[in-house]
Amino acid sequence: MAIILGIDPGSRVTGYGVIRQQGRQLIYLGSGCIRTQVPDLPSRLKRIYAGVSEIITQFSPDVFSVEQVFMAKNADSALKLGQARGVAILAAVNNDLPVFEYAARQVKQSVVGTGGADKSQVQHMVRSILKLSAAPQADAADALAIAITHCHFNQNLLRVGDPRLVLTRGRLR
């Protein structure tokens, strides 16, 4: 059983999603957005750091998963996104969480089945996978999708030297 925190970083809106993995079952614990209303970037970064730290304290996740920075058409936007991502990762590292990174196309492929999926498709599949009554807001859905992707990619994560691993039918389990 593991609690996974997914983060969809943004300099104005940072989405978060928390799920628990119990075997093959994924259980929704919470999601939302950290909104930064202040105009200056340093204050926004401070709010993102504080918000992510608060979420970590509230949910006590075992793992932190975050979307990788993609190349934006606007270099200034990409730099701001990278800074927002950096303070979110810093909050995780300061709380001794392992950090895992996933590309946006990888997340969409994992959750929807195609790397070119749009936001509404991601929202729909997150709702379906986690059995939610309504689709989460786009940024929160992206964060939940990142957490789901971590579960998919690490379902059979091998820990070298783990004495509990047993070779069964050609697979380490």
Curated annotation (Swiss-Prot):
Names of required cofactors: Mg(2+)
Catalytic residues, chain numbering: 8, 67, 139
GO terms, biological process: DNA recombination; DNA repair
Class in the EC hierarchy, top level: hydrolase
Cofactor mode of binding and number, as noted: Binds 2 Mg(2+) ion per subunit.
HAMAP family given in the database record: RuvC (MF_00034)
Highest classification ranks of the organism: Bacteria, Pseudomonadati, Pseudomonadota, Gammaproteobacteria, Enterobacterales
InterPro entries in the cross-refs: RNaseH-like_sf, RNaseH_sf, X-over_junc_endoDNase_Mg_BS, X-over_junc_endoDNase_RuvC
Protein's name according to its UniProt entry: Crossover junction endodeoxyribonuclease RuvC
Subcellular location: Cytoplasm
Catalysed reactions listed for this entry: Endonucleolytic cleavage at a junction such as a reciprocal single-stranded crossover between two homologous DNA duplexes (Holliday junction)
An example Gene Ontology molecular-function term: DNA binding
Signal peptide start and end residues: none
Subunit structure: Homodimer which binds Holliday junction (HJ) DNA. The HJ becomes 2-fold symmetrical on binding to RuvC with unstacked arms; it has a different conformation from HJ DNA in complex with RuvA. In the full resolvosome a probable DNA-RuvA(4)-RuvB(12)-RuvC(2) complex forms which resolves the HJ.
Keywords carried by this UniProt record: Cytoplasm, DNA damage, DNA recombination, DNA repair, DNA-binding, Endonuclease, Hydrolase, Magnesium, Metal-binding, Nuclease
Role played: The RuvA-RuvB-RuvC complex processes Holliday junction (HJ) DNA during genetic recombination and DNA repair. Endonuclease that resolves HJ intermediates. Cleaves cruciform DNA by making single-stranded nicks across the HJ at symmetrical positions within the homologous arms, yielding a 5'-phosphate and a 3'-hydroxyl group; requires a central core of homology in the junction. The consensus cleavage sequence is 5'-(A/T)TT(C/G)-3'. Cleavage occurs on the 3'-side of the TT dinucleotide at the point of strand exchange.
GO cellular component: cytoplasm; Holliday junction resolvase complex
